[in-house]
Amino acid sequence: MSTWANLGLQDSASPLMEQLIFFHDHALLILVMITVLVGYLMFMLFFNNYVNRFLLHGQLIEMIWTILPAIILLFIALPSLRLLYLLDEINEPSVTLKSIGHQWYWSYEYSDFNNIEFDSYMIPTNELTTDGFRLLDVDNRVILPMNSQIRILVTAADVIHSWTVPALGVKVDGTPGRLNQTNFFINRPGLFYGQCSEICGANHSFMPIVIESVPVNHFIKWISSNNS
Protein backbone atom coordinates (compact mmCIF):
# COMPACT_ATOMS: atom_id res chain seq x y z
CA MET A 1 0.00 0.00 0.00
CA SER A 2 1.04 3.61 -0.33
CA THR A 3 2.70 4.77 2.88
CA TRP A 4 3.22 8.22 4.36
CA ALA A 5 5.62 10.48 2.42
CA ASN A 6 5.94 7.92 -0.38
CA LEU A 7 6.69 10.02 -3.46
CA GLY A 8 7.38 7.10 -5.80
CA LEU A 9 5.46 4.07 -6.97
CA GLN A 10 4.40 1.34 -4.57
CA ASP A 11 6.63 -1.71 -4.16
CA SER A 12 5.71 -4.22 -6.82
CA ALA A 13 4.14 -7.57 -5.96
CA SER A 14 3.90 -8.94 -9.51
CA PRO A 15 6.22 -9.28 -12.53
CA LEU A 16 4.01 -6.95 -14.59
CA MET A 17 4.29 -4.18 -12.01
CA GLU A 18 8.07 -4.65 -11.99
CA GLN A 19 8.10 -4.16 -15.76
CA LEU A 20 5.93 -1.04 -15.43
CA ILE A 21 8.36 0.42 -12.89
CA PHE A 22 11.32 -0.40 -15.15
CA PHE A 23 9.61 1.34 -18.07
CA HIS A 24 8.80 4.35 -15.89
CA ASP A 25 12.47 4.65 -14.90
CA HIS A 26 13.57 4.14 -18.51
CA ALA A 27 11.26 6.90 -19.80
CA LEU A 28 12.21 9.21 -16.91
CA LEU A 29 15.91 8.79 -17.70
CA ILE A 30 15.30 9.81 -21.33
CA LEU A 31 13.27 12.84 -20.20
CA VAL A 32 16.02 13.92 -17.79
CA MET A 33 18.62 13.64 -20.57
CA ILE A 34 16.45 15.76 -22.90
CA THR A 35 15.90 18.35 -20.15
CA VAL A 36 19.65 18.61 -19.47
CA LEU A 37 20.44 18.96 -23.19
CA VAL A 38 17.80 21.65 -23.77
CA GLY A 39 18.88 23.50 -20.62
CA TYR A 40 22.51 23.45 -21.76
CA LEU A 41 21.58 24.78 -25.23
CA MET A 42 19.43 27.56 -23.75
CA PHE A 43 22.26 28.51 -21.39
CA MET A 44 24.66 28.71 -24.33
CA LEU A 45 22.23 30.87 -26.33
CA PHE A 46 21.68 33.30 -23.47
CA PHE A 47 25.31 33.81 -22.49
CA ASN A 48 27.24 33.44 -25.78
CA ASN A 49 26.63 36.25 -28.25
CA TYR A 50 28.83 34.85 -31.01
CA VAL A 51 27.77 31.22 -31.29
CA ASN A 52 25.57 31.75 -34.39
CA ARG A 53 27.26 34.85 -35.78
CA PHE A 54 28.17 33.34 -39.17
CA LEU A 55 25.36 30.76 -39.43
CA LEU A 56 23.63 31.20 -42.82
CA HIS A 57 22.05 27.76 -43.21
CA GLY A 58 21.97 24.70 -41.01
CA GLN A 59 21.25 21.53 -42.93
CA LEU A 60 23.30 19.44 -40.52
CA ILE A 61 21.56 20.75 -37.43
CA GLU A 62 18.15 20.32 -39.10
CA MET A 63 19.03 16.70 -39.86
CA ILE A 64 20.12 16.21 -36.25
CA TRP A 65 16.94 17.66 -34.72
CA THR A 66 14.81 15.59 -37.10
CA ILE A 67 16.57 12.24 -36.77
CA LEU A 68 17.44 12.41 -33.06
CA PRO A 69 13.82 12.82 -31.82
CA ALA A 70 12.76 9.92 -34.09
CA ILE A 71 15.42 7.68 -32.51
CA ILE A 72 14.40 8.81 -29.01
CA LEU A 73 10.73 8.02 -29.77
CA LEU A 74 11.76 4.54 -30.93
CA PHE A 75 13.59 3.96 -27.63
CA ILE A 76 10.34 4.87 -25.82
CA ALA A 77 7.84 3.20 -28.17
CA LEU A 78 9.42 -0.27 -28.46
CA PRO A 79 9.50 -1.06 -24.70
CA SER A 80 6.04 0.51 -24.37
CA LEU A 81 4.53 -1.69 -27.10
CA ARG A 82 6.16 -4.79 -25.61
CA LEU A 83 4.65 -3.95 -22.23
CA LEU A 84 1.20 -3.28 -23.72
CA TYR A 85 1.16 -6.75 -25.27
CA LEU A 86 2.37 -8.33 -22.02
CA LEU A 87 -0.42 -6.61 -20.09
CA ASP A 88 -3.06 -7.97 -22.48
CA GLU A 89 -1.69 -11.50 -22.60
CA ILE A 90 -3.83 -14.08 -20.79
CA ASN A 91 -1.82 -17.06 -19.59
CA GLU A 92 -3.27 -20.39 -18.48
CA PRO A 93 -4.94 -19.35 -15.18
CA SER A 94 -4.83 -21.44 -12.01
CA VAL A 95 -7.67 -19.48 -10.41
CA THR A 96 -10.42 -17.32 -11.88
CA LEU A 97 -11.96 -14.59 -9.74
CA LYS A 98 -15.02 -12.60 -10.75
CA SER A 99 -15.45 -9.11 -9.33
CA ILE A 100 -18.73 -7.19 -9.59
CA GLY A 101 -18.85 -3.50 -8.76
CA HIS A 102 -21.88 -2.07 -6.97
CA GLN A 103 -22.73 1.29 -5.49
CA TRP A 104 -20.70 1.17 -3.23
CA TYR A 105 -19.14 -2.21 -2.53
CA TRP A 106 -17.59 -5.15 -4.37
CA SER A 107 -18.91 -8.68 -4.66
CA TYR A 108 -16.71 -11.63 -5.57
CA GLU A 109 -17.28 -15.08 -7.03
CA TYR A 110 -14.96 -18.09 -7.12
CA SER A 111 -16.40 -20.59 -9.59
CA ASP A 112 -13.45 -22.91 -10.35
CA PHE A 113 -14.07 -25.25 -7.42
CA ASN A 114 -17.64 -24.68 -6.44
CA ASN A 115 -19.61 -21.46 -6.23
CA ILE A 116 -18.21 -19.26 -3.45
CA GLU A 117 -19.74 -15.79 -3.33
CA PHE A 118 -19.42 -12.94 -0.86
CA ASP A 119 -19.72 -9.17 -0.62
CA SER A 120 -16.87 -6.93 0.50
CA TYR A 121 -17.77 -3.69 2.29
CA MET A 122 -15.51 -1.03 3.73
CA ILE A 123 -15.24 -1.19 7.52
CA PRO A 124 -16.60 2.11 8.92
CA THR A 125 -14.19 4.23 10.93
CA ASN A 126 -16.13 3.72 14.18
CA GLU A 127 -15.81 -0.09 13.81
CA LEU A 128 -12.10 -0.21 12.91
CA THR A 129 -9.64 -2.01 15.14
CA THR A 130 -6.55 -0.15 16.35
CA ASP A 131 -4.39 -1.78 13.66
CA GLY A 132 -6.87 -1.14 10.83
CA PHE A 133 -6.44 1.31 7.97
CA ARG A 134 -9.03 4.05 7.62
CA LEU A 135 -11.07 3.87 4.37
CA LEU A 136 -8.99 0.89 3.19
CA ASP A 137 -9.94 -2.16 5.28
CA VAL A 138 -12.87 -4.40 4.37
CA ASP A 139 -14.97 -6.96 6.20
CA ASN A 140 -14.23 -9.76 3.67
CA ARG A 141 -10.82 -9.91 2.02
CA VAL A 142 -10.11 -11.55 -1.33
CA ILE A 143 -7.94 -14.61 -0.66
CA LEU A 144 -5.65 -15.55 -3.56
CA PRO A 145 -2.69 -17.95 -3.88
CA MET A 146 0.79 -16.59 -4.46
CA ASN A 147 3.02 -17.85 -7.29
CA SER A 148 -0.04 -18.73 -9.38
CA GLN A 149 -1.57 -17.22 -12.50
CA ILE A 150 -4.77 -15.41 -11.52
CA ARG A 151 -7.42 -14.35 -14.01
CA ILE A 152 -9.92 -11.72 -12.93
CA LEU A 153 -13.21 -10.97 -14.65
CA VAL A 154 -14.61 -7.53 -13.87
CA THR A 155 -18.09 -6.17 -14.48
CA ALA A 156 -20.56 -3.84 -12.77
CA ALA A 157 -24.18 -4.02 -11.73
CA ASP A 158 -25.13 -0.34 -11.94
CA VAL A 159 -22.58 2.28 -13.10
CA ILE A 160 -18.98 2.14 -14.35
CA HIS A 161 -16.45 1.12 -11.69
CA SER A 162 -12.74 0.33 -11.91
CA TRP A 163 -11.04 -2.50 -10.00
CA THR A 164 -7.52 -1.27 -9.22
CA VAL A 165 -4.65 -2.67 -7.15
CA PRO A 166 -1.51 -0.54 -7.74
CA ALA A 167 1.00 -3.01 -6.22
CA LEU A 168 -0.06 -5.61 -8.80
CA GLY A 169 -0.17 -3.20 -11.74
CA VAL A 170 -3.85 -4.01 -12.30
CA LYS A 171 -6.60 -1.59 -13.33
CA VAL A 172 -9.70 -2.99 -15.03
CA ASP A 173 -12.89 -1.07 -15.76
CA GLY A 174 -16.13 -2.67 -14.65
CA THR A 175 -18.85 -1.77 -17.15
CA PRO A 176 -22.50 -2.86 -16.86
CA GLY A 177 -23.31 -5.48 -19.48
CA ARG A 178 -19.66 -6.09 -20.34
CA LEU A 179 -17.13 -8.58 -18.95
CA ASN A 180 -13.50 -7.38 -18.94
CA GLN A 181 -10.61 -9.61 -18.02
CA THR A 182 -6.94 -9.46 -17.17
CA ASN A 183 -4.42 -11.63 -15.39
CA PHE A 184 -1.70 -11.17 -12.80
CA PHE A 185 0.85 -13.20 -10.87
CA ILE A 186 1.41 -12.43 -7.19
CA ASN A 187 5.01 -13.23 -6.30
CA ARG A 188 4.96 -12.61 -2.55
CA PRO A 189 2.57 -13.03 0.38
CA GLY A 190 0.94 -10.07 2.07
CA LEU A 191 -1.96 -7.64 2.02
CA PHE A 192 -2.43 -5.47 -1.05
CA TYR A 193 -4.81 -2.54 -1.03
CA GLY A 194 -6.66 -0.84 -3.85
CA GLN A 195 -9.70 1.30 -4.50
CA CYS A 196 -12.31 1.95 -7.14
CA SER A 197 -10.63 4.25 -9.66
CA GLU A 198 -13.65 5.45 -11.62
CA ILE A 199 -15.91 8.10 -10.10
CA CYS A 200 -19.12 6.19 -9.45
CA GLY A 201 -21.23 8.36 -7.19
CA ALA A 202 -21.38 9.89 -3.73
CA ASN A 203 -19.54 7.07 -1.92
CA HIS A 204 -16.99 6.37 -4.65
CA SER A 205 -14.09 6.68 -2.18
CA PHE A 206 -15.68 4.17 0.21
CA MET A 207 -15.31 0.95 -1.79
CA PRO A 208 -11.76 -0.31 -1.17
CA ILE A 209 -10.21 -3.59 -2.31
CA VAL A 210 -8.06 -5.82 -0.10
CA ILE A 211 -6.23 -8.86 -1.47
CA GLU A 212 -4.64 -11.32 0.93
CA SER A 213 -1.94 -13.33 -0.84
CA VAL A 214 -1.27 -16.67 0.86
CA PRO A 215 0.69 -19.86 0.04
CA VAL A 216 -1.15 -22.35 -2.16
CA ASN A 217 -1.71 -24.88 0.64
CA HIS A 218 -3.34 -22.19 2.82
CA PHE A 219 -5.54 -21.19 -0.12
CA ILE A 220 -6.64 -24.81 -0.60
CA LYS A 221 -7.51 -25.03 3.12
CA TRP A 222 -9.51 -21.79 2.84
CA ILE A 223 -11.40 -23.11 -0.20
CA SER A 224 -12.08 -26.42 1.59
CA SER A 225 -13.38 -24.66 4.71
CA ASN A 226 -15.72 -22.53 2.60
CA ASN A 227 -16.91 -25.62 0.72
CA SER A 228 -17.89 -27.30 3.93
Swiss-Prot record:
Effect on the protein of changing N115S: In strain: HW00, HW09, NC37, NC48, TT00 and TT01
Coiled-coil regions, chain positions: none
Outcome, altering F118Y: In strain: MD106, MD225 and RU35
Binding residue positions for Cu cation A1: H161, C196, C200, M207
GO terms classed as biological process: ATP synthesis coupled electron transport
Enzyme Commission number: 7.1.1.9
UniProt: Mg(2+) binding residues: E198
Main location: mitochondrion
Side of membrane Mitochondrial intermembrane, spans: 1-26, 83-228
GO cellular component: mitochondrial inner membrane
UniProt GO MF annotations: copper ion binding; cytochrome-c oxidase activity
Catalytic reactions of this protein: 4 Fe(II)-[cytochrome c] + O2 + 8 H(+)(in) = 4 Fe(III)-[cytochrome c] + 2 H2O + 4 H(+)(out)
InterPro entries: CcO_II (IPR045187), CcO_II-like_C (IPR002429), CcO_II_C (IPR034210), Copper_CuA (IPR001505), Cupredoxin (IPR008972), Cyt_c_oxidase_su2 (IPR014222), Cyt_c_oxidase_su2_TM_dom (IPR011759), Cyt_c_oxidase_su2_TM_sf (IPR036257)
Residues that, per the record, bind Cu cation A2: C196, E198, C200, H204
Entry keyword Transcription regulation: no
Keywords: Copper, Electron transport, Magnesium, Membrane, Metal-binding, Mitochondrion, Mitochondrion inner membrane, Respiratory chain, Translocase, Transmembrane, Transmembrane helix, Transport
Transmembrane segments: 27-48, 63-82
Intervals, Mitochondrial matrix compartment: 49-62
Enzyme class per UniProt: translocase
Note on how the cofactor is bound: Binds a dinuclear copper A center per subunit.
Family, similarity comment: Belongs to the cytochrome c oxidase subunit 2 family.
Subunit note: Component of the cytochrome c oxidase (complex IV, CIV), a multisubunit enzyme composed of a catalytic core of 3 subunits and several supernumerary subunits. The complex exists as a monomer or a dimer and forms supercomplexes (SCs) in the inner mitochondrial membrane with ubiquinol-cytochrome c oxidoreductase (cytochrome b-c1 complex, complex III, CIII).
Function, as annotated: Component of the cytochrome c oxidase, the last enzyme in the mitochondrial electron transport chain which drives oxidative phosphorylation. The respiratory chain contains 3 multisubunit complexes succinate dehydrogenase (complex II, CII), ubiquinol-cytochrome c oxidoreductase (cytochrome b-c1 complex, complex III, CIII) and cytochrome c oxidase (complex IV, CIV), that cooperate to transfer electrons derived from NADH and succinate to molecular oxygen, creating an electrochemical gradient over the inner membrane that drives transmembrane transport and the ATP synthase.
Protein name in UniProt: Cytochrome c oxidase subunit 2
Lineage, uppermost ranks: Eukaryota, Metazoa, Ecdysozoa, Arthropoda, Hexapoda
